[in-house]
């Protein structure tokens, strides 16, 4: 039985790998994609997502989502992914268009039509998910769980303590973490370990058409290097869905700092229970790196 999922994303070079895995992993049934501003503007993330769907010749509904955070000015990660979000490969022209409704309404409608609760996977800022939960609370029973790439129990990657996806819209993340839905958080504690080695990266051009495309994108990706290895942050959320045994999880109370002068966007992960509050998130704290790398190689070999 394949697991039905909806994927909220902001492609993004490592998003491209996660999208490939979500589409072609046999255990998963990707039924809806939505885009959000994050790595680059929502117009660019939508264009990039549609380019990938056309590249693989798959027909998955896609809705464009939030262009700006809930309350603050937007920020991006073009310095990591390039100005287009997926620099390095020339995709062919196409005439695909997103659905005519906002992402959070597309998620609502698809949830209400689904015959069983659906797993949401969010690998960008959580703006669309916060809009869904705040504007359509009747949807909560139809969400099986939310798996996110975001946050950190320790160091950040865009401030000393904050991870980019959370820091891009802390108010949205706070809304989601307080919602009461089941959440699995794959943050920097595991994603910084999720490295594809230079030796493996060198094999991609000979693997298949997708391998050639990803190798070209990776040459412009700034989360590591082709010489030292590249971190596959977003792919961890997909990996947990099908290979949860690769991850060490701990239930923790997690809150999002929205006020601090230096700490805004930080996920406060109460690993030791100091605050005495009930756990609201299952936090991934460690990763079987060899097992992850083997799984990635298996999945990418399945992609055309």
Curated annotation (Swiss-Prot):
Active site residues of this protein? 233
Residue stretches in coiled coil: none
Question: Which keywords accompany this UniProt record?
Answer: Glycosidase, Hydrolase
> Organism's domain of life?
Bacteria
**Entry EC number(s):** 3.2.-.-
Q: Which GO terms describe its molecular function?
A: purine nucleosidase activity; uridine nucleosidase activity
An annotated GO cellular component of this protein is:
cytosol
Tell me a GO biological process for this protein: pyrimidine nucleobase metabolic process
State whether keyword Hydrolase applies.
yes
Spell out the family assignment given in the record's similarity comment: Belongs to the IUNH family. RihC subfamily.
Q: What does this protein do?
A: Hydrolyzes both purine and pyrimidine ribonucleosides with a broad-substrate specificity.
Q: What is this protein called?
A: Non-specific ribonucleoside hydrolase RihC
Q: Which organism is it from?
A: Escherichia coli O127:H6 (strain E2348/69 / EPEC)
